[in-house]
From Swiss-Prot:
UniProt feature, compositional bias: Acidic residues: 284-305
Any coiled-coil regions, as ranges: none
Polar residues bias locations: 43-52, 120-145, 153-162, 178-189, 237-253
Additional detail: Present with 18600 molecules/cell in log phase SD medium.
Keyword Acetylation: yes
Listed name of the protein: Uncharacterized protein YLR257W
Basic and acidic residues compositional bias, start-end: 204-229, 306-315
A GO cellular-component term linked to this record: cytoplasm
Protein's organism: Saccharomyces cerevisiae (strain ATCC 204508 / S288c)
Intracellular or extracellular location(s): Cytoplasm
């Protein structure tokens, strides 16, 4: 920092903050530059605004045309400001909650109307001729599960009978399977809560059914197969229990030690025979070997086997002389 006289202040024993540099050349040049820039800005305000606008336009040209900036909307008057009369805003296109409620009510009415039409079509199909229903049931493609399991009776003319009266018990037992065939409903048998069992239900089915082969062909919830498999399982279980070893076997005191038995799941032997087993087996093998030697079955390895005279004579004749 140099003052007007060209000398530098001495900082020995003093601080730089206490130095008066108002007369320095650097301070005078800085103040003069700031005053000139402020005067030029005050004299030409229109020029600065035009420069800013041109710069914005250049930026807009460079930017993507599909994007609209907030500044553009504000210049065009698209944004609501304090200068706009908010009371005169056109709100005719704004949807209210009342319109939503009316639309919801209309939608519910349409759904109810469609449901009624569907019920009418189902009722009309149920009153159709039995021949048409039979032709539909024969096809696996067109057959569907019925809405109601109750099947009404038809007269020879094709009109339904006993529609208003009470349904018979036979009709309640008849249902339609997934193939469209009419079968008896035996899915609720046996009724275990009433004390029935699978054996009683199987006997009842065999007694009431005219032919057993036809009963097996019906698909009544596979109740017949379940009853049969359960009966077979019970029989096999009783057989396996009867084959098992007798746990409560009494031993008579007169037999003594010979009555002690070694039992397994399949057989039982005496403990005496079990202890004497290693001695009995070699004796049995020796006896069998002696019997075989007596019968002439075994041959010695030394080559001094004894043959009968007939065999020796036949062998001598066969040898070439």
């Amino acid at each position: 920092m140099v003052d007007a006289r060209g000398s530098t202040p001495c900082l020995i024993g003093d601080s730089i903050r206490n130095v008066n540099d108002g007369n320095s050349l650097d301070f005078q040049y800085t103040n003069q530059f700031n005053e000139e820039s402020e005067a030029s800005r005050l004299l030409t305000p229109q020029t600065s605004s035009n420069h800013a606008l041109s710069k914005m336009q250049k930026d807009d040209d460079i930017r993507d045309r599909s994007y609209t900036s907030v500044a553009e909307l504000n210049r065009e008057g698209a944004l609501l400001t304090d200068e706009v009369d908010l009371e005169n805003v056109d709100a005719s296109k704004v949807r209210s909650n009342r319109d939503d409620l009316e639309a919801e009510e209309k939608r519910k009415k349409l759904l109810l109307l469609k449901k009624k039409q569907r019920n009418k079509s189902i009722n009309s199909e149920s009153f159709s001729s039995p021949s048409l229903r039979a032709s539909k049931s024969n096809s696996l493609i067109t057959s569907t599960d019925p809405v109601e399991d109750h099947i009404s009776k038809y007269s020879s003319s094709g009109t339904p009978e006993n529609i208003t009266g009470e349904a018979d018990d036979e009709d309640e037992d008849i249902i339609r399977n997934s193939y469209g065939q009419m079968i008896k409903n035996n899915s609720n048998r046996p009724h275990l809560a009433k004390g029935e069992s699978y054996q009683s239900a199987e006997q009842e089915i065999d007694h009431t059914a005219p032919e057993k082969s036809e009963k097996r062909q019906e698909r009544s919830g596979r109740s017949f197969d379940r009853q049969k498999s359960s009966a077979e399982f019970l029989r096999s279980l009783s057989r396996s229990i009867s084959r098992g070893p007798t746990k409560n076997k009494t031993v008579s005191p007169s037999k003594g030690e010979d009555s002690r038995m070694y039992s397994t799941s399949n057989y039982s032997i005496s403990l005496v025979d079990l202890e004497n087993g290693p001695k009995i087996i070699p004796e049995t093998l020796e006896e069998e070997q002696e019997d075989a030697e007596k019968e002439g079955v075994l041959m010695e390895d030394e080559g001094n086997e004894e043959y009968t005279k007939d065999l020796e004579e036949a062998a001598n004749k066969a040898q070439p002389q």
